[in-house]
Amino acid sequence: MSQASKRKHVVQEVLGEHMVPSDQQQIVKVLRTPGNNLHEVETAQGQRFLVSMPSKYRKNIWIKRGDFLIVDPIEEGEKVKAEISFVLCKNHVRSLQKEGHWPEAFSEVAEKQNNVNRESQPELPAEPQLSGEGSGSEDDSDLFVNTNHRQYHESEEESEEEEEEAA
């Protein structure tokens, strides 16, 4: 299977499939990512441990702090105690809450994330700004500044000298 088709199938599996955790599996929240496809997670009971990411998800699915996962326990692990079996997106979280499979300890966290996402969406302005109004070259403070390049600042004296030379 090529890399592109593998990625397509993994993404379809994660986004489309509805997953309910079995008796052995548990829902956890990602706290941090120390590296090497390991993630530090916390259970609803407050227990913290490391989980490993299986190779099918590596370089295909990205997990960030605050995401929720379904994990399978690993019996022989001392530090790494589970393996990720499913990455939960917002739709999965909502459906698990409706069905009553969502842990009470994570209910407030999931609600806060939904509210923050709703509030962070920018509202469109009621009246579009005309191109002539307020879009002068004098006010460039809202432009993106690339910090990877040197910043060249032109002094007023240099700009006056250039204007005099041009005349």
Curated annotation (Swiss-Prot):
Signal peptide annotation: none
GO molecular function per UniProt: RNA binding; translation initiation factor activity
Phosphothreonine modified-residue sites: T33
Sequence positions bearing Phosphoserine: S131, S135, S137, S155, S159
Disulphide bonds in the chain: none
Occurrences of domain S1-like (ranges): 5-89
Cellular component terms (Gene Ontology): cytosol; nucleoplasm; nucleus
Keyword Secreted tagged: no
SMART domains in the record: eIF1a (SM00652)
Assigned keywords, A-Z: Nucleus, Phosphoprotein, RNA-binding
Compartment annotation: Nucleus
Region ranges (Disordered): 104-167
Acidic residues compositional bias, start-end: 155-167
Ranges spanned by the short sequence motif Nuclear localization signal, renumbered to the chain: 6-12, 56-65
PROSITE patterns assigned: S1_IF1_TYPE (PS50832)
Main location: nucleus
Pfam family, one: eIF-1a
Function noted in UniProt: Plays a role into cellular response to oxidative stress. Decreases cell proliferation.
Protein family (similarity comment): Belongs to the EIF1AD family.
Subunit relationships: Interacts with GAPDH and STAT1.
Name under which the protein is recorded: Probable RNA-binding protein EIF1AD
Taxonomic lineage from the root: Eukaryota, Metazoa, Chordata, Craniata, Vertebrata
